[in-house]
Amino acid sequence: ADCVGDGQKCADWFGPYCCSGYYCSCRSMPYCRCRSDS
């Protein structure tokens, strides 16, 4: 279960998934990126 960290590209529907403590933000199109959820 690989995960990607802060600022890395992610796709919340099929992966790659963000590491624990991050969520996938798609506001900066065309890419989704992991942001800290704190």
From Swiss-Prot:
UniProt KW keywords: Amidation, Disulfide bond, Ion channel impairing toxin, Knottin, Neurotoxin, Secreted, Toxin, Voltage-gated sodium channel impairing toxin
Disulfide bonds: 3-19, 10-24, 18-34, 26-32
Gene Ontology MF terms: sodium channel regulator activity; toxin activity
InterPro entries per record: Beta/delta-agatoxin_fam
SUPFAM superfamilies: omega toxin-like
Subcellular localization: Secreted
Coiled-coil ranges per UniProt: none
Superkingdom of this protein's organism: Eukaryota
Protein's UniProt keywords contain Glycoprotein: no
GO CC field: extracellular region
Primary localization class, coarse: secreted
Expression (tissue specificity): Expressed by the venom gland.
Modified residues (Serine amide): 38
Domain remark from Swiss-Prot or TrEMBL: The presence of a 'disulfide through disulfide knot' structurally defines this protein as a knottin.
Protein task: Insecticidal neurotoxin that induces irreversible neuromuscular blockade in house crickets (A.domesticus). Modifies presynaptic voltage-gated sodium channels (Nav), causing them to open at the normal resting potential of the nerve. This leads to spontaneous release of neurotransmitter and repetitive action potentials in motor neurons.
Entry's family note: Belongs to the neurotoxin 07 (Beta/delta-agtx) family. 02 (aga-3) subfamily.
Name the record gives this protein: Mu-agatoxin-Hc1c
Protein species of origin: Hololena curta (Funnel-web spider)
Lineage of producing organism: Eukaryota, Metazoa, Ecdysozoa, Arthropoda, Chelicerata
